[in-house]
């Protein structure tokens, strides 16, 4: 694995600017039971049982700015964009194309030794998973994995190409205060996410849906003295998701699929 990054901070007048660009090349050996780029897709994942080597290339781009609007208030925003290309060199071969972007505007307030912040974000993710058996002698099966260790075998002799998409919306509240030598930071946030999986976008054949939400709280406390620094952190997380393996029926004339449950 190797990576190259470029990062810069600039101040032009009252505006603070930040930018980052990166490239990551990674190779993994003896990979199996994992045909996805990451662990974002909660409910329904493609996989296979044959070990093989995987190579991935990742491209990252981020930018942000902040601008004071008064002696106590400031505003800013951040944008993140990522592309990940992944391929396996052994049948059954999964080729993945991942793209995601997220925009996060926010405001901050500072008064003395206390700071308050609030931000919202919207994100969009897409992944195309193309599973193929290129060799002509042996056809290996593909599997769909579900939570709690459940699996389903897909029909043999067919190549699989599924399209994953997700939309996510959420926000955070932050508070930081200094009390003598003790500093306390707290953050609470949450998000809603909707995920869809389609195997035929023209005929609208859906393979599954997932609705989820998450609430999390974290805190960091630090105590600083001339000779020592002590730091504590804690976190509480609630995460829930409902996944649906849809029942569908195909129209005889138009060929379009309709979900019934």
PLM regions with names:
Residues 1, 29-36, 86-94, 129-135, ...:
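Outer-membrane beta-barrel translocator domains and adjoining extracellular loop/strand segments
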Residues 1-4, 55-61, 92-103, 165-171, ...:
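Residues that define the transmembrane beta-barrel architecture of outer-membrane proteins
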Residues 4-10, 61-67, 103-109, 171-177, ...:
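Residues on the lipid-exposed face of transmembrane beta-strands in outer-membrane beta-barrel proteins
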Residues 11-15, 70-72, 110-112, 178-182, ...:
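Outer-membrane beta-barrel channels and translocator barrels
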Residues 19-25, 77-83, 118-124, 186-192, ...:
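Transmembrane beta-barrel strands of outer-membrane/channel proteins
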Residues 33-45, 121-165, 194-208:
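Short, flexible helix-coil linker/hinge segments at the edges of structured domains or between repeats
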Residues 45-51, 87-93, 156-161, 198-209, ...:
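Extracellular loop and loop/strand-boundary signature of outer-membrane beta-barrel proteins
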Residues 66-89, 98-101, 187-200, 235-239:
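Surface-exposed extracellular loop regions of Gram-negative outer-membrane beta-barrel proteins
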């Amino acid at each position: 694995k190797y990576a190259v990054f470029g990062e810069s901070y600039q101040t032009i007048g009252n505006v603070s600017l930040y930018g980052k660009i990166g490239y990551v090349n990674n190779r993994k050996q003896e990979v199996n039971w994992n045909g996805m780029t990451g662990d974002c897709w909660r409910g329904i994942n493609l996989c296979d049982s044959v070990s093989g080597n995987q190579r991935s290339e990742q491209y990252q781009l981020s930018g942000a700015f902040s601008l004071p609007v008064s002696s106590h208030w400031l505003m800013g925003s951040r944008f993140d964009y990522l592309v990940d290309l992944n391929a396996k060199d052994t049948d059954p071969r999964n080729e993945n194309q991942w793209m995601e972007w997220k925009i996060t505007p926010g405001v901050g307030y500072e008064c003395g030794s206390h700071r308050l912040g609030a931000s919202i974000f919207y994100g969009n993710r897409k992944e195309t998973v193309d599973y193929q058996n290129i060799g002509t002698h042996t056809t290996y099966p593909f599997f769909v994995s579900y939570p709690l260790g459940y699996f389903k075998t897909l029909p043999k002799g067919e190549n699989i190409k599924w399209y994953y998409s997700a939309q996510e919306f959420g926000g955070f509240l932050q508070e930081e205060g200094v009390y003598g030598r003790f500093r306390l930071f707290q953050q609470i946030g949450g998000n809603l996410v909707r995920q869809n999986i389609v195997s035929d976008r023209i005929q609208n054949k859906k393979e599954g849906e997932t609705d989820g939400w998450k609430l999390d709280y974290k805190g960091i406390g630090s105590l600083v003295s001339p000779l020592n620094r002590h730091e504590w952190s804690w976190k509480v997380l609630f995460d829930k998701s409902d996944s649906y393996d849809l029942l569908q029926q195909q129209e005889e004339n138009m060929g379009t699929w309709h979900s019934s449950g």
